[in-house]
Amino acid sequence: MRVVFMGTPEFSVPILTAIIGHGYEVVAAYTQPPRPAGRRGLELTRSPVHEKAEQFGIPVFTPKSLKGAEEQDVFASLEADVAIVVAYGLLLPKAILDAPRLGCYNGHASLLPRWRGAAPIQRAIMAGDAETGMMIMKMDEGLDTGPVAMAEKVAITPDMTAGELHDRLSMIGADLMIRALGALERESLALQPQAEEGVTYAAKIDKAEARIDWSKPAKDVHNSIRGLSPFPGAWCEMEINGAVERVKLQRSTLGEGSGAPGTVLDDRLTIACGEGAVRLATLQRSGGKPLPAQEFLRGQRVTKVL
């Protein structure tokens, strides 16, 4: 079976690796173009999928768009049986969707139709969802609206971070995709339309959302911290030894106590919220590495959180 793989971030890599490992012929990998990196943006960084594909000697394509006739002709010339799409980052026009003999299949990190869109892992945790999952669907022209081929649910534990959920769903996605490809080869892959009720959209995370609002209930603050960990990272300003610094908050738990929002309630970094309190467990100063709260506080006095 001739496969075109389309993906960009680290989340996609285990699925690409599994497809290769199970003997499928990956004739090309499509990924986002290299991005400027470094302080001056003079270096170009290739995506994780780009790096992995080159390790296996797979031709890599990095178009900025797939809307043009030239890009669509190149894609069609690959004569793919199927395209596998996992966090690629570009919408696929009809000409691309129709080119593979068996269609295009997407690995999506939510229980559709909940959390269609760009940031399903973060949004599920930030909303306080108790469960999410991984789904394989056949793509159509809508945004994550196609019929579902396979799904697996995953519980979201109370202190689970987006990073932890990301890694788990990525591995589940690899297993589901291999099963889906096998069923597709056997012509036994059954498709079920998505429910019409319960549709929500997982908008891309806005930078402004990363700043913690201590006037919100502790539950919401805690969900924001873990839902934005490790990237982009929730943050706040702290008065440390008399100077105000910006600090990233990577882990937290629900705490006990009350007070004006932002009040430091004890020497274990329990912070009062609009309702209840949150205990900060892992913090990161600018230019530093993430530290457990006890180590972060060594020789430091936090008097105020803004």
UniProtKB/Swiss-Prot annotation:
E.C. number: 2.1.2.9
Keyword terms of this UniProt record: Protein biosynthesis, Transferase
Record carries keyword Cell membrane: no
One Gene Ontology cellular component: cytosol
Top EC class, one word: transferase
Superkingdom is: Bacteria
In this record, what's one Pfam family? Formyl_trans_N
- Chain residues that bind (6S)-5,6,7,8-tetrahydrofolate: S110, L111, L112, P113
Instruction: State the InterPro entries in the record.
Output: Fmt, Formyl_trans_C, Formyl_trans_C_sf, Formyl_transf_N, Formyl_transf_N_sf, Formyl_transferase-like_C_sf, GART_AS, Met-tRNA-FMT_C
Q: What does this protein do?
A: Attaches a formyl group to the free amino group of methionyl-tRNA(fMet). The formyl group appears to play a dual role in the initiator identity of N-formylmethionyl-tRNA by promoting its recognition by IF2 and preventing the misappropriation of this tRNA by the elongation apparatus.
User: This chain belongs to which protein, by name?
Assistant: Methionyl-tRNA formyltransferase
Taxonomic placement: Bacteria, Pseudomonadati, Pseudomonadota, Alphaproteobacteria, Hyphomicrobiales
Gene name tied to this protein: fmt
